[in-house]
From Swiss-Prot:
It comes from Escherichia coli (strain K12). One of its GO terms (biological process) is regulation of DNA-templated transcription. The gene is ygbI. SUPFAM superfamilies: NagB/RpiA/CoA transferase-like, Winged helix' DNA-binding domain. The keyword Disulfide bond does not apply. The keyword S-adenosyl-L-methionine does not apply. Residues 20-39 bind DNA. GO terms for molecular function: cis-regulatory region sequence-specific DNA binding; ligand-modulated transcription factor activity. This is Uncharacterized HTH-type transcriptional regulator YgbI.
Length: 255
């Protein structure tokens, strides 16, 4: 049986069962564990499946972005750990970008005492928090307002970002996989691509609960990022897949 035939069978089994173990696949196709792993890694790179401990499953699909209020109650411990680790990478006197989101808000909460810092953001909550609690210089992108996420999106925000020179961009996402970060909102894509182009260093900050999720629009491939910061809930198989792509992975320990 040639690889393309095996991979088609894998996709059919995953579609039927949702989650399939590696043992089931080796028995079904009478091939080695290593052969199946190579097939699964290829399918995961294509975004067709997600590797989990001992098996494989279909990628979850994000149909819409949760509101800011909903996101504040999700993965709070993980976001706090990621925020603390990410903030430790910021140097005094630098110009950084904090993407819209509650994970990046957690970064802001660890930066309030840093001297001579410039923070660019498209997030009203982050800007408001830093305005009340820090002495840093704040630059808001402006643009079309997304009420649900209390942030600015679209071409006007992207155009503003293209006029800046950013040292570090901390970029968030509602879904990510080995293919990259994706979003159900097309007007967020142009903003993420603009900040990626405007920044000297690009850091993805995303908790492990969002790994293996996909949405309609691929915003950025993982190859665009210099570092990825996530939490220790990321499956070992996912860590291996990311490291295999020569991606720099930092894992924040949940406290």
């Amino acid at each position: 049986m040639i690889p393309v035939e095996r991979r088609q069978i894998i996709l059919e089994m995953v579609a039927e069962k949702g989650i399939v173990s590696i043992a089931e696949l080796t028995d079904r196709m009478n091939v080695s564990h290593m052969t199946i792993r190579r097939d699964l890694q290829k399918l995961e790179q294509q975004g067709a499946v997600v590797l989990v401990s001992g098996g494989v499953q279909s990628p979850g699909r994000v149909a819409h972005e949760p509101s800011h209020q909903v996101k504040t109650a999700l993965a709070m411990t993980q976001k706090a750990a990621i925020g603390k680790l990410a903030a430790s990478l910021v140097q005094p006197g630098s110009c950084i970008y904090l993407d819209a989101g509650t994970t990046t808000l957690a970064i802001a909460q660890h930066l309030i005492h840093m001297e001579s810092l410039t923070v660019v953001t498209n997030d009203f909550v982050i800007a408001d928090y830093l305005l009340d609690n820090s002495n840093c210089t704040i630059i808001h992108t402006g643009g079309a307002v997304c009420r649900e996420n209390r942030s600015c999106v679209g071409e006007a925000a992207a155009t503003m970002l293209r006029s800046l020179m950013i040292d570090q961009a901390f970029i968030s996402a509602s879904s990510w996989s080995v293919r990259g970060i994706s979003t159900p909102a097309e007007d967020k894509v142009t903003v993420k691509r603009a900040i990626a182009s405007a920044s000297r260093q690009r850091v993805l900050v995303c908790d492990a609960t969002k790994y293996g999720q996909v949405a309609t629009w691929l915003a950025l491939p993982l190859s665009e990022f210099d570092q990825i910061i996530t939490d220790d809930g990321l499956p070992e198989s996912a860590s291996r897949a990311l490291v295999k792509q020569d991606l720099s992975l930092l894992v924040a320990k949940n406290e």
